[in-house]
Amino acid sequence: MKNSVNNFQVSGFAIKDVETKQFGNMTLGKFAVSISRTEKDKEGKDVRKSCILNFDAWRKNENASTLDCIKKGELITVEGYFSPDEYEKDGEKRQVSRHICTKVYSTPDKDEPGKEE
């Protein structure tokens, strides 16, 4: 597989509309998606586990409309890569992993989102 390292694809629900900000000829879209899955607990009961992932999507201004599908409550699929980043806070270096979105699109509803078949 070509370029199979450091890629992701997740589907979930946008928790709010995308927030955009222009920088010269580029637009930054920031958004978050709630993802979940069903797992079995120790007693064998189904338990829903979920978390929120934050994403950054850079687009040329003329392509910023590709982010229009990111509306609160919409089921979307996000593809991209992880980008390591460093910053300093209170004199201490910190590291984070950013989720960089390269593609985002509406996803058809499933009968049971997050449930593996």
Kindly give the residue locations of the regions a language model identified.
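Single-stranded nucleic acid-binding surfaces, predominantly the OB-fold ssDNA-binding core
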Residues: 1-117
